[in-house]
C-alpha cells in the first residue's frame, strides 16, 4: 500500500529505517539515521494519528460512522465482524442513545459512541480531532452530505457515503454539488467515495464489472430493484420515510440517445420477472447512479431505473399526497412551524424496527445489452437477499442490509488501499474485482445470466 497524501511535518520517534525511501508524503522522523530496529518501515501520518506499516500492511483502521439508523446498524456490526481491518470504530449521531443501543449488541469489538450534530461543521471537526479517524462513513441524511464533506476537508480525513446530496428545501438530488469538491479533495490528498450502498453502489460496481469482463461497449442499462418482502404493516418505508417518499414522488427521468427525458411520477410501468420471485409490476423512476454511469460509460445509448411497488403501498401514498402530508413546505400549526413530511416520518414505523417479522427477499441487479467481439450480448447480474437471514445476522431487514454491507465493503476497500485515490469518485471509477469478491464473502452473493431475455 502506498500513500499519496501530503502531511504537515510531524515526527514519530522510534522504529524508523535508516534508508531514505520515498514515503509518498508521510514524514520520516528525526531518528532517520538510527539503525532500523525492524525490517518493517513505519511512518506516521499526523492528520489521522495513523501509523502505517508498509511491508505487511498492518495499520490502524479507525472508522467514524455518522448516523444511527438501520443502515448504520448493519454497517457497524459487519465492521465488527471484520475486526482485523476495522480496529477502532466510533458511531456518532444526534441521539447518542441510539448509538449506544447498537454498540451494546456488539461483543467482540469495542464501539465507541458520541453525540454530534451533522449539520454543525465545527462540532464535526471537534469530534474528528478527538477520535482521529482514517475514514468518515456518512450514513446520515443526504441533506448533511456537504456539511460532513466540509468538515472532512477542514480536519483532513477521507470520506464515504451511500446517497448523494439533496437540498433540504427542494426534492431534487444530483451529483453536481459533490463533484464540485473534486479539486479540493485531490489537493488535500483525500479520497471521497460517493454512493457506496446497493443502488447506488453495488449497481455501479456491477456495471463496471460487466464493462471490464463481458463487454467492449455498453449500449443499454436497466437497473431493476424489487422488494418482494412483507413487513406485515399497513404502510411503512424500508428506509428513512422522508427521504423515501421525496424520492418516489419526484418525476421519473431516464437517459436515451444523449438526452434526459422526464415522465410523470410512477406513470411508466410494466411487469418484470425477478429470479426466485416471479413477475412484479416495476415503475420507472429517476435514481442518482444513472447520472454518473452515463458519464463514465459514454457508449450507453439508454439507461433507466425500475423499482417495484405494491398497489396497497401506492394507494396509501396517493392518499397522503392528496391531503398534503408529503409536502416539504413548512406550515404553521398552533404557532409552531412544522414540515408535513417530517411529521409523517415521526408517526410512521421506524424502518430499523421492521426486521423481526419481515419475510420474503429483495432482488436487485443490472440488465445490460452491448457488444463483445462485435457480437450483441445480454447480461444480467443480480443479488437476492433474504429479509429473515439479514435479521438473524444483524437484527435489521434486508433493505438496510443491502445498503450497510456495501458501505462496509467500500470502507474496507479504502483501508486496504484498493480504493484510495485523491479526489471525489463514484464507485464505478474504481476496480470492481476486489469489491465483487467481497460481496460473496460478506453476505451478498451475486449471480449472472448470459444471453437471457432482458424484457426491456
Each language-model region and where it sits:
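Rossmann-fold cofactor-recognition segment
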Residues: 106-120
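C-terminal catalytic/substrate-binding lobe primarily of soluble NAD(P)-dependent oxidoreductases
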Residues: 212-456
Amino acid at each position: 500500500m502506498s500513500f499519496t497524501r501530503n502531511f504537515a511535518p510531524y515526527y514519530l520517534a522510534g522504529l524508523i529505517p535508516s534508508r531514505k525511501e520515498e514515503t509518498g508524503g508521510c514524514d520520516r522522523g528525526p531518528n532517520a539515521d538510527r539503525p532500523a530496529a525492524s525490517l518493517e518501515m513505519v511512518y506516521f501520518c499526523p492528520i489521522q494519528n495513523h501509523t502505517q506499516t508498509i511491508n505487511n500492511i498492518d495499520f490502524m483502521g479507525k472508522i467514524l460512522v455518522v448516523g444511527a439508523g438501520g443502515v448504520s446498524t448493519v454497517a457497524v456490526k459487519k465492521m465488527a465482524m471484520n475486526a482485523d481491518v476495522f480496529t477502532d470504530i466510533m458511531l456518532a449521531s444526534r441521539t447518542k442513545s441510539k448509538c449506544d443501543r447498537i454498540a451494546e449488541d456488539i461483543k467482540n469489538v469495542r464501539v465507541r459512541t458520541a453525540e454530534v450534530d451533522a449539520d454543525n461543521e465545527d462540532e464535526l471537526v471537534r469530534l474528528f480531532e478527538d477520535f482521529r479517524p482514517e475514514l468518515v462513513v456518512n450514513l446520515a441524511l443526504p441533506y448533511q452530505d456537504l456539511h460532513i464533506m466540509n468538515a472532512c476537508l477542514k480536519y483532513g480525513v477521507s470520506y464515504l457515503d451511500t446517497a448523494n446530496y439533496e437540498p433540504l428545501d427542494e426534492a431534487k438530488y444530483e451529483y453536481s454539488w459533490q463533484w464540485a469538491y473534486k479539486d479540493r479533495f485531490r489537493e488535500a490528498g483525500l479520497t471521497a467515495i460517493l454512493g457506496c450502498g446497493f443502488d447506488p453502489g453495488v449497481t455501479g460496481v456491477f456495471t463496471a464489472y460487466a464493462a471490464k469482463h463481458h463487454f467492449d461497449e455498453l449500449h443499454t442499462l436497466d437497473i431493476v430493484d424489487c422488494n418482494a418482502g412483507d413487513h406485515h404493516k399497513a404502510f411503512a418505508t424500508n428506509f428513512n420515510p422522508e427521504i423515501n417518499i421525496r424520492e418516489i414522488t419526484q418525476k421519473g427521468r431516464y437517459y436515451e440517445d444523449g438526452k434526459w427525458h422526464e415522465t410523470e411520477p410512477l406513470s411508466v410501468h410494466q411487469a418484470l420477472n425477478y429470479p426466485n420471485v416471479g413477475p412484479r409490476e416495476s415503475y420507472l423512476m429517476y435514481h442518482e447512479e444513472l447520472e454518473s454511469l452515463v458519464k463514465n460509460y459514454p457508449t450507453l445509448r439508454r439507461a433507466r431505473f425500475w423499482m417495484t411497488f405494491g398497489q396497497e403501498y401506492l394507494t396509501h401514498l396517493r392518499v397522503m399526497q392528496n391531503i398534503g402530508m408529503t409536502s416539504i413546505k413548512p406550515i404553521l400549526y398552533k404557532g409552531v412551524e412544522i414540515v408535513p413530511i417530517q411529521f409523517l416520518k415521526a408517526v410512521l414505523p421506524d424502518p430499523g424496527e421492521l426486521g423481526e417479522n419481515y419475510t420474503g427477499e429483495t432482488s436487485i441487479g443490472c440488465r445490460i445489452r452491448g457488444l463483445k467481439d462485435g457480437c450483441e450480448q445480454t447480461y444480467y447480474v443480480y443479488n437476492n437477499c433474504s429479509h429473515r437471514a439479514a435479521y438473524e445476522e444483524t437484527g435489521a431487514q434486508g433493505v438496510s442490509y443491502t445498503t450497510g454491507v456495501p458501505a462496509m465493503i467500500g470502507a474496507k476497500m479504502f483501508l486496504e488501499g484498493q480504493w484510495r485515490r485523491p479526489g471525489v469518485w463514484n464507485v464505478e471509477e474504481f476496480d470492481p474485482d476486489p469489491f465483487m469478491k467481497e460481496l460473496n464473502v460478506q453476505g451478498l452473493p451475486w449471480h449472472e445470466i448470459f444471453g437471457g431475455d432482458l424484457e426491456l
